[in-house]
Regions:
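Hydrophobic alpha-helical segments and helix pairs
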Residues: 1-14, 18-19
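A cross-domain feature marking catalytic cores of carbohydrate-active enzymes
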Residues: 3-5, 35-39, 63-67, 90-92, ...
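A short, structure-level motif marking secondary-structure boundaries and short turns
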Residues: 6-9, 35, 96-99
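Short, small-residue-enriched loops and turns at beta-alpha junctions
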Residues: 8-12, 39-43, 67-71, 132-134
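Short secondary-structure boundary/capping elements
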Residues: 14-17, 41-44, 107-108
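Histidine-acidic metal/acid-base catalytic patches
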Residues: 24, 29, 46-59, 69-152
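Hydrophobic, aromatic-enriched interface-forming segments
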Residues: 34-49
Length: 152
C-alpha cells in the first residue's frame, strides 16, 4: 500500500515512530508499505526519504520522478532513492507543468529505466496520467505504453 508522508513541519521522530508502527502491523499481514514522494511533505527531499527508509525497516518508496522536474524539489538528484523504490508512478512533466503530453516533457525515461534495470527492478509501475480537457486520454496512455515497451 502507498501512504502519504507527513506534511513539512511535522517532527521527524514522530513520523518515524508512526511509520514504524504502521509498517510493523502491515508486515505481519504480508503487506508492503510505501511512502510516496510528494512536494511539501517530509518525503520530498531525497536525503529525508533516505533517512526515513533507513530508519523504518521494510519501508519502501512509491516514486514519482515528476516531483524532481516540477515543484519545490527541482534539480535534486533522486538517484540515491533507487534502492528503496517499490512502486513507480509515470507521467511526463516539464519545469512549468506537473503533467504535459507524453513526449513534451523533460522526464528522462531512458535513464530512469536503465537505472532501474541495473538495480534489477521487478516491481510495479503505474501510468498516472490525469485526463485533461482537449487531450485524448487513451492516446496519451498508448503513447506512454509504446514508450515504455521500447525501453524495456
Amino acid at each position: 500500500i502507498t501512504v502519504p508522508s507527513a506534511k513539512l513541519g511535522t517532527p521527524f521522530n514522530e513520523e518515524v515512530e508512526h511509520l514504524q508502527r504502521l509498517v510493523a502491523l502491515a508486515h505481519k499481514e504480508g503487506v508492503q508499505v510505501n511512502i510516496r514522494n510528494q512536494s511539501d511533505c517530509l518525503a520530498a527531499d531525497p536525503d529525508t526519504i533516505t533517512v526515513l527508509c533507513d530508519n523504518v525497516d521494510n519501508l519502501g518508496l512509491a516514486f514519482d520522478p515528476s516531483v524532481y522536474v516540477c515543484g519545490s524539489e527541482v534539480g535534486k538528484d533522486p538517484e540515491k532513492l533507487i534502492k528503496y523504490i517499490r512502486h513507480l508512478y509515470l507521467r511526463d512533466s516539464s519545469p512549468d507543468n506537473y503533467q504535459v503530453r507524453v513526449g513534451q516533457g523533460t522526464v528522462d525515461y531512458g535513464q530512469l529505466v536503465h537505472t532501474l534495470n541495473k538495480m534489477q527492478y521487478r516491481r510495479a509501475m503505474s501510468v498516472d496520467i490525469v485526463p485533461q480537457e482537449g487531450i485524448e486520454h487513451s492516446a496519451e496512455m498508448r503513447k506512454m505504453r509504446l514508450l515504455l515497451e521500447s525501453l524495456l
